[in-house]
Amino acid sequence: MGMSRISLAINFCLLGLAIAQNSPQDYLNAHNSARARVNVGPMRWDDRVAAYATNYANQRKGDCRLVHSGGPYGENLAWSSADLSGTAAVNLWVAERPNYDYNSNSCVGGECRHYTQVVWRNSVRLGCAKVRCNSGGTFITCNYDPPGNYVNQRPY
């Protein structure tokens, strides 16, 4: 009986951790931490952008393919066959930082455009959403207003 209580307590702690890493503030903290490292001002949560992200994430539940929405916002997508927190998704995008060469304003050695969208100086409003795919995986989208990643422009 004592062991099952411990197991239940651990499960609740893990559930709380997973929920905490998916709040608007957690998405903002992950983005703003990366932005601060390159002296870019913070983003703020925008309910209109978040509603757009939620609507699109719900459309992707059936197949969870990494297909961009084609909407009016900048967009980063993430998918995992297991559970993925919003914070972990942002950290995946930020992990592309070593591939961005500021001097040539290009990606070298791999993908970097998810990272450059995270730190795009003019993108100041953020909205993100996470859904559980019908297949059991996780789909996450973050949308940015105004969008970034314009050709021949530096993110900061």
Report the location of each language-model feature.
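Cleavable N-terminal signal peptides of Sec/SRP-targeted secreted and luminal proteins
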Residues: 3-20
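A structural signal for short loop-to-beta-strand junctions that line the ligand-binding cleft
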Residues: 65-68, 78, 115-119
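Generic alpha-helical structural context detector
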Residues: 54-58, 79, 91, 95
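Disulfide-stabilized extracellular recognition modules
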Residues: 73, 83-156
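Short, well-ordered surface patches within globular domains
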Residues: 19-74
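A positional/structural detector of protein chain ends, strongest at the extreme C-terminus
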Residues: 1-4, 155-156
